[in-house]
């Protein structure tokens, strides 16, 4: 039981699961997703640009939650003006992550409440990605 609690806390569950209707992914799931290069999936790193510039999951976009908590409530033109990239299509799956899962979960809720019906979370986020060597993979 304690191991399951620690795995949940650290985001290192060995399989994906759906909690409270929010799909969440493990490191192995994320590795497969990144390797597929699916144009219908958008990886959303919600850390600040200074964190993102150090290390991030390949092909992810940076939408910083702390400095832009309501970014997904913005219209597309204002989103692009403030964030510097086009606003993701609401028909795509958005997978949110941050450093440890907290900001990613918060940003996922904001996006869900503003018309994004296919949102997911990588709860282990960058801590899990780096601890499993994801930053060293050639994807």
From Swiss-Prot:
Residues at the catalytic site: 98
Pfam families tied to this protein: Rhodanese
Transmembrane segments: none
Activity regulation as described: GSS(-) is a potent inhibitor of RDL1, since the presence of the sulfur dioxygenase strongly increases the RDL1 catalytic activity.
Enzyme Commission code: 2.8.1.-
CDD domains associated with the record: RHOD_HSP67B2
GO cellular component terms, A-Z: endoplasmic reticulum; mitochondrial outer membrane; mitochondrion
Gene3D superfamilies: Rhodanese-like domain
Locations listed in the record: Mitochondrion
The organism's place on the tree of life at top rank: Eukaryota
UniProt keywords, alphabetically: Mitochondrion, Phosphoprotein, Transferase
Domain Rhodanese intervals: 37-138
Keyword hit for Lipid metabolism: no
Top class in the EC scheme: transferase
BP GO annotations: sulfur compound metabolic process
Modified residues (Phosphoserine): 26
Entry's Gene Ontology molecular function annotations: thiosulfate-cyanide sulfurtransferase activity
InterPro entries: Rhodanese-like_dom, Rhodanese-like_dom_sf
PROSITE patterns with a match to the protein in the record: RHODANESE_3
Chief location of this protein within or outside the cell: mitochondrion
Catalytic activity: thiosulfate + glutathione = S-sulfanylglutathione + sulfite + H(+)
Outcome of swapping residue 98 to A/S: Leads to the loss of catalytic activity
Primary role: Thiosulfate:glutathione sulfurtransferase (TST) required to produce S-sulfanylglutathione (GSS(-)), a central intermediate in hydrogen sulfide metabolism. Provides the link between the first step in H(2)S metabolism performed by the sulfide:quinone oxidoreductase (SQOR) which catalyzes the conversion of H(2)S to thiosulfate, and the sulfur dioxygenase (SDO) which uses GSS(-) as substrate. The thermodynamic coupling of the irreversible SDO and reversible TST reactions provides a model for the physiologically relevant reaction with thiosulfate as the sulfane donor.
Miscellaneous comment in the UniProt entry for this protein: Present with 7470 molecules/cell in log phase SD medium.
Name recorded for this polypeptide: Thiosulfate:glutathione sulfurtransferase
């Amino acid at each position: 039981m304690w191991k399951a609690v620690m795995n949940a806390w650290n985001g290192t569950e060995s399989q994906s699961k759906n909690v409270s209707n929010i799909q969440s992914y493990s490191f192995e799931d994320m590795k497969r997703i990144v390797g597929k290069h699916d144009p219908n999936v958008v990886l959303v790193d919600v850390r600040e640009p200074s964190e993102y510039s150090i290390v991030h999951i390949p092909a992810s976009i940076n939408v910083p939650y702390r400095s832009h908590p309501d970014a997904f409530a913005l219209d597309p033109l204002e989103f692009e003006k403030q964030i510097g990239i086009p606003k993701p299509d609401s028909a795509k799956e958005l997978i949110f992550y941050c450093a440890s899962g907290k900001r990613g979960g918060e940003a996922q809720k904001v996006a869900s409440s503003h018309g994004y019906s296919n949102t997911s979370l990588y709860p282990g986020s960058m801590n899990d990605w780096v601890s499993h060597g994801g930053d060293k993979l050639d994807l």
